[in-house]
UniProtKB/Swiss-Prot annotation:
Function: Catalyzes the conversion of dihydroorotate to orotate with quinone as electron acceptor.
Record's protein name: Dihydroorotate dehydrogenase (quinone)
One example GO MF annotation: dihydroorotate dehydrogenase (quinone) activity
Lineage: Bacteria, Pseudomonadati, Pseudomonadota, Alphaproteobacteria, Hyphomicrobiales
Pathway assigned to this chain's UniProt record: Pyrimidine metabolism; UMP biosynthesis via de novo pathway; orotate from (S)-dihydroorotate (quinone route): step 1/1
Protein's cellular compartments: Cell membrane
Length: 364
């Protein structure tokens, strides 16, 4: 079935503009007719940041920006899904066209700019699924014109605290001017301090401690990774997601669209994001949860992320090229890998190749 989608379904969707195709796929999931889940395998269940995930594969933020189809995504076989990025006020993002396919590279360049319907719309939709099972995280961001961007992140924590199973603080999108500056040590210290203070205050009121993850860029120098690791450890952050899209265009084959401005995702991001993942694992040690994102499009690439240091993995662009059967295909492949490797749980495979990946050189 996956092969059938790649030849027929993808051809049909790719006849549309990339953003139109995205809207059509959301509409398709809303029908409830697309269900391709894999059976639960206890060997894939992992406990991360106090949450029990049925399997380590998640849907990355960016697809379900406005919390329209979280449960439909879980039915595809994902162990968790992440909505957003959500900003306090609605914003339209950057002018169209702003999503570009690089088919030969199985990649996408986007410069969306946090287009979303805002807190109110997402809150209303998530409230309708309150009490349902399934781990749904909320990825929070800042409005482009915010005078105090950190206040926007704090507002996200407070608004969605009862509904989110975890939060992701997104300071690594390259499409909001100046946003990545929040990754600098002094700015990051203030950001994490205020966000975690809000989390702790909300947690005391309802006796629930929601994990907070930080999503970082793959274009950071080793010294910048040092600073992020130190600050995350010092402030007892719950985990780090590695990584967002890259500004690098190293090794691309596609002639069409390669020079478009924006962040690159998909297969070409795999090596870079995995190297940064491994380097961060070496810096934070064995206890801090890390989530690997970037170029995951098969059980093999998901397993490679885990062996490089990831507790969980996420994908998005792979779904564009491989179709809705991909999550179940990966989950089945990970089950087979656990048996093949002779371990009782997927977590036992983490860090097996961390040193090797951390030593690799990043392409310019």
């Amino acid at each position: 079935m996956s092969g059938l989608f790649e030849t027929l379904g993808r051809r049909a969707l790719f006849a549309f503009d990339a953003e139109q195709a995205h809207g059509l796929s959301i509409a398709g999931l809303k029908t409830g007719l697309v269900t391709c889940g894999a059976p639960n395998d206890p060997a894939l269940s992992v406990k991360v940041a106090g949450l029990q995930f049925p399997n380590p594969l998640g849907m990355a933020a960016g697809y379900d920006k406005n919390a329209e189809v979280p449960d439909a995504l879980l039915k595809l076989g994902f162990g968790f899904t992440e909505i957003g990025t959500i900003t306090p006020r609605p914003q339209s993002g950057n002018p169209r066209p702003r999503i570009f396919r690089l088919v030969e590279d199985r990649a996408v360049i986007n410069r969306l700019g946090f287009n979303n319907e805002g807190h109110d719309a997402a809150f209303k939709r998530l409230s309708q699924r309150a009490g349902k099972s399934g781990i749904v995280g909320v990825n929070i961001g800042a409005n482009k014109d915010a005078e105090d961007r950190i206040a926007d992140y704090v507002a996200g924590i407070r608004r969605f605290y009862q509904l989110a199973r975890y939060f992701t603080v997104n300071i690594s999108s390259p499409n909001t001017p100046g946003l990545r500056n929040l990754q600098a040590r002094d700015s990051l210290r203030e950001l994490l301090s205020r966000v975690l203070e809000a989390r702790n205050e909300e947690g005391k009121m309802c006796t629930l401690k929601r994990p907070v993850f930080l999503k970082i860029a793959p274009d950071l120098a080793n010294e910048e990774l040092d600073d992020i690791a130190a600050e995350a450890t010092e402030q007892k952050l719950d985990g780090i997601i590695i990584s967002n899209t890259t500004l690098s265009r190293a090794g691309l084959k596609s002639a069409e669209n390669r020079d478009e401005t924006g962040g690159l995702s998909g297969a070409p991001l795999f090596d870079r994001s995995t190297i940064v993942l491994a380097r961060m694992r070496e810096r934070v040690g064995p206890d801090m949860p890390l989530i690997g994102v970037g170029g995951v499009d098969s059980a093999e690439t998901a397993l490679t992320k885990i062996k490089a240091g990831a507790d969980l993995v996420q994908l998005y662009t792979g779904l564009i090229y491989r179709g809705p059967n991909l999550p179940a295909e990966i989950v089945r492949g990970l089950s087979a890998a656990v048996k093949r490797e002779g371990v009782t749980n997927i977590a036992a495979l983490r860090d097996r190749d961390t040193k090797d990946w951390a030593r690799r050189e990043l392409s310019a």
